[in-house]
Amino acid sequence: AKHSAGEFELHCDINNPVTSEQLPTPTNIALILHTSGTTSRPKIVPILHSNIVSSAENIKRSLRLTEEDICMNIMPLFHIHGLIAAVSASIAAGGSVWCTPGFDALKFFRWLDDASPSWFTAVPTMHQAILARAQRNRDIIDRNKLRFLRSSSASLPSQVMKELERVFGAPIIEGYGMTEATHQMASNPLPPLEQKPGSVGLEAGPKIRIAHETENHLIDGTGEVVISGPNVTPGYENNLEANKNSFFTFEGERWFRTGDQGAFDADGYLSLTGRLKEIINRGGEKISPLEVDEVLMDHPSIVQVVTFAVPHEKLGEDVAAAVVLEDGSKVTESDLKAFASDRMVDFKVPKKIVILSEIPKGATGKLQRIGLAETLGLT
C-alpha cells in the first residue's frame, strides 16, 4: 500500500488470557499505534489507558475545554493527533465532536457551516490549504466564529500563524506532540497569556527538559528535548534497541528522548530547531531546516516550503528546498536564491530550490524531509 507502515509482530502472554469479564485497568494497553516514521522506520507504540486519561486532561486544561465546546474533527483517527486532541480531550470535557470523513479542503467550509464548531485542530499543511480557500468563503467564516484554532504534529510557520489569526479573528494555538507522549507535551497558551510565533509554547502536561544529545544527563541551553510524565508510553513494542536509545534514567526519573533539538527562552517557552536527524551538516556547519523554512516563507510568492539535505561530494550534505508558489507566480529559482542570500549567511542559502505544484506528504499530512532528495531525484 502507498502509505503502508510495514509488517509488525505483536506479542501477548498466551498463558494468561484476558477474559471478557475482566475490566481494563489503568496499566492495560488501550491503543496500539505506530510512529509517523518521519526520520526512520515506523515503530509500534502501545498506549495505556492511564496515558490517554492523562493526555486528555492535559489538553482539556490547556484549551479550557468545557461541555459547551464543539470540535470539528478533520484529522485521521488512525493517528494520535485526532484520537487524543480532538476526540479524547473533548470527551474528557463533556464536549461534542463533529466528525468529518477526513480532511478535504474543498468541503471544509461547508462542514464549518454545518457544524458551527468552537474549534478545530489540524496539521500545518491542512491550515495552509484552508487559507488558500478562505477568501472565497468569507461569509461562512463571518457567521461561524471560532473560539480558537489549534495546530500540531509539525512546525507552524509564523507567517501562517499570523494569517490564520487575521482571517479567522481567533487565536491559533500551536501545540507540540508526538505518539510516544500520547500527543501533547507543550502548548502556547490561550489569551490573555502570550503566544509566541515560532515557539511550541510552555510545558502542558509532562515535565520537559533539555538533555545532552549523546550522554544521559540534563543540560542548560540547546540540546535534545526530553519528557517525563504519566502520558509517556512505557516503551516501544518488541524493540529493545529503540527503547535503549530512547529512554534513560537521571536522578531517579525516567526520561524519553523526543529526537527533537530545542531550547527554552527566559519565559519558559520552548522553541524547536528541528529533528536531530534532519539537521543539515554542511561540511561541519549545522543548519536548522526550520530556520531556512522561516526565511523563505517571508517571500510573498511562496505558500509552502520544506528545506532538506542533499548529498554533496565534498561537504557531505548541502541545503536544498522545495517550494509551492502562489497560482500565476512567475518567480524563478534564481529569484528565490537571491531573496534568501539577502537574509542569510551564504552557507545556509539553498543551493537547489525545486518549484513544485505540491510537496509530497505522509499519510497524516506531514511534510517529509527525510528521503525527499531521493524522491525528487536529487541524489
Predicted segment positions?
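Conserved pre-ATP/AMP-binding loop-to-beta segment of ANL
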Residues: 15-34, 41, 64-70
